[in-house]
């Protein structure tokens, strides 16, 4: 977007510019990374982080210092693994062992990988992977063990999918396969992060006993991305929408993108959104377990972005024609709200759930189920943060009683004041009349004079009235029409 186009856009959408400016000016990170105290390999890791994901880089660099480097390295390790899996130029016979043995390779000092295709966007990370390995050697053993264990699980899962000819040819078939794929690429990430949070005492240990909450966090993010990226994946000959869902609406996958099937495609996307929305309550419950503000920000921002993205793609025909994403202004607004507390984040979810409900079409076969799910989200939020808090109601009633009593007191004071003023006037009037009488005033003569003057005025008015009546003719002649 050119400078002139941007200026015109912001003139027409001033609220977008306002949100961006507010975020830039008023956002104060909980923690700030200090590059002056970092080694060269640490600085290199953060450069790789910024090159692979600017959005995640920003929130990672504001984390509590205890988790700053472990989570940065965790992200880079999984990104390196993902870069190998996504590269279609690597032969399967070479790719499978790389994925399965990646956790062992990252223990070899100086190991790098230079065989990615030239167009693979994150190939530089693997070319300089020795920087990541050098820093992995320095992290605390409990953190390293968590990173390694998740890398083993994810590498094996990716290798299994790479060998799955049916998946590679026809994509995902069932909802179970769809959720298993989301587990390997996102659910495991959530598991690793939760264990890191708890190990550092920055999250409630009870989260380890409710791993379904962690799973929902990853599922919600990954499903949202899959729905949003449908056009991009179609162009790349990939299909992640389960056949169990899309086959209800069209005969072939290609039919989803034909203009004449647009309404059917929208109904299919509605069911996909419904499938993602079922994780929202777990996500909100999970966020309540964060004990550190920077960690809360880290988990809340992506979730708020996800619910906003679901609202954007819901019944939006543009997703079948191009890639869509929330505006930068909306993103800044969401980040401002998501870096406060759980109550504010719940309000974000409530707001977007209501927007989804408003966009819902009664002709859509998923209309009722989506309406119910939106209602469940509101009901869950209401159970955490009641809008009619009994304590607040009692306090308001007490304040109203005090105000009523104050008004009653005020009314009594006002009456007393008016009567006092009238009494003062009578007393002052009496004193003045008494003083005049003592000075020799003749009130009897004044009374007679006033009576005579009033009689004269009355008689004169009667005479004028009689003369006027006698001058009016008794008959009025009308001209011929």
Swiss-Prot record:
One of its GO terms (biological process) is isoprenoid biosynthetic process. GO terms for cellular component: endoplasmic reticulum membrane. Pfam families: SQS_PSY. It is a multi-pass membrane protein. The gene is erg-6. It catalyses: 2 (2E,6E)-farnesyl diphosphate + NADPH + H(+) = squalene + 2 diphosphate + NADP(+); 2 (2E,6E)-farnesyl diphosphate + NADH + H(+) = squalene + 2 diphosphate + NAD(+). InterPro entries: Isoprenoid_synthase_dom_sf (IPR008949), Squ/phyt_synthse (IPR002060), Squal_synth-like (IPR006449), Squalene/phytoene_synthase_CS (IPR019845), Trans_IPPS_euk-type (IPR044844), Trans_IPPS_HH (IPR033904). Catalyzes the condensation of 2 two farnesyl pyrophosphate moieties to form squalene. It is the first committed enzyme of the sterol biosynthesis pathway. Required for the biosynthesis of ergosterol. It is found in: Endoplasmic reticulum membrane. PANTHER family: FARNESYL-DIPHOSPHATE FARNESYLTRANSFERASE, SQUALENE SYNTHASE. GO terms for molecular function: squalene synthase [NAD(P)H] activity. This is Probable squalene synthase. Its EC number is 2.5.1.21. Pathway: Terpene metabolism; lanosterol biosynthesis; lanosterol from farnesyl diphosphate: step 1/3. It comes from the Eukaryota. The lineage of its organism: Eukaryota, Fungi, Dikarya, Ascomycota, Pezizomycotina. CDD domains: Trans_IPPS_HH. Keywords: Endoplasmic reticulum, Isoprene biosynthesis, Lipid biosynthesis, Lipid metabolism, Magnesium, Membrane, Multifunctional enzyme, NADP, Steroid biosynthesis, Steroid metabolism, Sterol biosynthesis, Sterol metabolism, Transferase, Transmembrane, Transmembrane helix. Its cofactor is Mg(2+). Belongs to the phytoene/squalene synthase family. The chain crosses the membrane at residues 294-314, 416-436.
């Amino acid at each position: 977007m050119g400078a002139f186009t941007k200026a015109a856009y912001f003139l027409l959408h001033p609220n977008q510019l306002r949100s961006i400016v507010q975020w830039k000016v008023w956002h104060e990170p909980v923690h700030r990374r200090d590059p002056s105290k970092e080694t060269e390999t640490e600085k290199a890791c953060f450069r790789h982080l910024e090159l692979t994901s600017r959005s995640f880089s920003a929130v990672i660099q504001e984390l509590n210092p205890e988790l700053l480097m472990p989570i940065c390295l965790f992200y880079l390790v999984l990104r390196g693994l993902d870069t190998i899996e996504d590269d279609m130029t690597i032969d399967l016979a070479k790719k499978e062992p790389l994925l399965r043995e990646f956790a062992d390779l990252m223990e070899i000092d100086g190991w790098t990988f230079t065989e990615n295709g030239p167009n693979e966007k994150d190939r530089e990370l693997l070319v300089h992977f020795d920087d990541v390995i050098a820093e992995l050697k320095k992290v605390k053993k409990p953190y390293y063990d968590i990173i390694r264990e998740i890398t083993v699980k994810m590498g094996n899962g990716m290798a299994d999918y790479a060998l799955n000819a049916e998946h590679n040819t026809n994509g995902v078939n069932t909802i179970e396969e769809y959720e298993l794929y989301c587990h390997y690429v996102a659910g495991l990430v959530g598991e690793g992060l939760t264990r890191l949070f708890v190990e550092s005492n920055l999250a409630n240990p009870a989260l380890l006993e409710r791993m379904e909450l962690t799973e929902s966090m990853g599922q919600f993010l990954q499903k949202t991305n899959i729905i949003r990226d449908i056009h991009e994946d179609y162009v790349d000959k990939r299909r992640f929408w389960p056949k169990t869902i899309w086959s209800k609406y069209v005969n072939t996958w290609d039919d989803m993108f034909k203009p004449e099937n647009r309404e059917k495609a929208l109904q299919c996307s509605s069911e996909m959104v419904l499938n993602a929305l079922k994780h929202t309550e777990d996500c909100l419950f999970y966020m309540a377990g964060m004990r550190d503000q920077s960690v809360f920000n880290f988990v809340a921002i992506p979730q708020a972005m996800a619910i906003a993205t679901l609202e954007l793609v819901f019944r939006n025909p543009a997703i079948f024609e191009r890639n869509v994403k929330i505006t930068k202004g909306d993103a800044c607004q969401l980040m401002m709200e998501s870096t406060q507390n759980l109550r504010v984040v719940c309000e974000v979810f409530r707001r977007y759930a209501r927007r989804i409900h408003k966009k819902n079409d009664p002709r859509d076969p998923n209309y009722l189920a989506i309406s119910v799910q939106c209602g469940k989200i509101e009901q869950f939020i209401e159970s955490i943060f009641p809008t009619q808090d009994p304590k607040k109601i009692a306090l308001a009633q007490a304040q109203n009683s005090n105000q009523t009593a104050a008004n009653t007191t005020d009314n009594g004071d006002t009456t007393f004041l008016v009567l006092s003023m009238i009494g003062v006037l009578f007393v002052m009037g009496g004193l003045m009349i008494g003083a005049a009488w003592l000075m020799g005033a003749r009130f009897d003569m004044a009374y007679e004079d006033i009576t005579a003057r009033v009689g004269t005025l009355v008689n004169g008015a009667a005479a004028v009235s009689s003369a006027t009546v006698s001058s009016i003719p008794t008959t009025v002649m009308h001209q011929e029409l």
